[in-house]
Amino acid sequence: MSQELITYIVLGSHERLKGLKLPASSNKEEYVLTNFSNDEPFEKTIDNIIFNSKGNLVVLLPPSALPNQKSKEILRKISMIDQSSWGWFKYNDRKNDFIKSLKKISSSVRSIPNIEQGIYFTKRLYFSVGGIGKFGTSPFNEISKRFYSRIDPQNPLPALIIRTKNLDIFQKWIIKHL
């Protein structure tokens, strides 16, 4: 496990992720697709991927989303500090519709990130709280509560670059297969 390496895990089913192009992995960044299937529970798939990942810091991302350069630099610094840490990304302020506004309010009031915000954490913290927990319609709900039981989150990082409007397919797939 490399202290500076960051593992980016893109969440979604095999069908949702099959045409997705990811940046090439390097000595500083590792990119992995979850490719959820009906053969294995989501929680076990994520636990196995995180266990086998090479990075000290893990970032769970929605399909077709990546952190911007500023966020990557901050994540690299967090990874190098080697302290238990977790947090999420801000909402993109450019897209402003009613539903997005409700999600922003919900996220700030509950202090639990939504799927389109992504979440990051250290591998050590993840396994100290027993893994992801129940992976339901709000995938980061359970794990956020577990992390809160240990430490407070970092301030949200700059918004993810989302290259699709099609995040609902991922959520519908999860709901349909729970």
Where does each model-flagged region fall?
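N-proximal low-complexity "stem/linker" segments adjacent to membrane-targeting elements
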Residues: 1-34
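C-terminal catalytic/acceptor-binding lobe
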Residues: 2, 137-138, 142-178
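Active-site nucleotide-sugar/metal-binding loop of Leloir-type enzymes
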Residues: 43-58
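Short beta-strand-to-loop acidic/aromatic patch adjacent to the donor-nucleotide binding site
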Residues: 54-68
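Short alpha-helix within the catalytic core of nucleotide-sugar-dependent glycosyltransferases
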Residues: 55, 69-80, 123-127, 132
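Conserved donor NDP-sugar-binding/catalytic core segment of glycosyltransferases
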Residues: 66-98
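A recurrent flexible, glycine/aromatic-enriched loop bordering the glycosyltransferase active site
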Residues: 84-94, 100-121, 127-128
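Aromatic-glycine-rich donor-binding/catalytic loop that engages nucleotide-sugar donors
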Residues: 112, 116, 120-138, 142, ...
